[in-house]
UniProtKB/Swiss-Prot annotation:
The modification 3-methylthioaspartic acid is found at residue 89. Belongs to the universal ribosomal protein uS12 family. It comes from Pectobacterium atrosepticum (strain SCRI 1043 / ATCC BAA-672) (Erwinia carotovora subsp. atroseptica). Pfam families: Ribosom_S12_S23. GO terms for molecular function: rRNA binding; structural constituent of ribosome; tRNA binding. GO terms for biological process: translation. Part of the 30S ribosomal subunit. Contacts proteins S8 and S17. May interact with IF1 in the 30S initiation complex. With S4 and S5 plays an important role in translational accuracy. GO terms for cellular component: small ribosomal subunit. HAMAP family: Ribosomal_uS12_B. The keyword Cell membrane does not apply. This is Small ribosomal subunit protein uS12. InterPro entries: NA-bd_OB-fold, Ribosomal_uS12, Ribosomal_uS12_bac. The keyword Calcium does not apply.
Amino acid sequence: MATINQLVRKPRSLKAAKSNVPALEACPQKRGVCTRVYTTTPKKPNSALRKVCRVRLTNGFEVTSYIGGEGHNLQEHSVILIRGGRVKDLPGVRYHTVRGALDCSGVKDRKQSRSKYGVKKPKA
């Protein structure tokens, strides 16, 4: 136990919080270029072919990003925007692709939850 005198000289230091999304470097989103677009299978007990892409970010990081929604137009060399947010059943996938930004199109024929999938309001 430290004495009062020791604490006056050198106060207790706070533990630095570890980021869940280190590649973003405290930014809300980052731009990057797809280096590989592929599908992968989730952990047990789930079963699917999840669409993901490997992205080289502007800050030099190379991360894996999940592509949400039904269908996408991404391929190698597509420029995309990524945001934080992990996919619980895909180990190592800690980022999401922002739909409707840069080269990534919005989800076709989407009527509900449109803002999450980059879809404009349909003409009434």
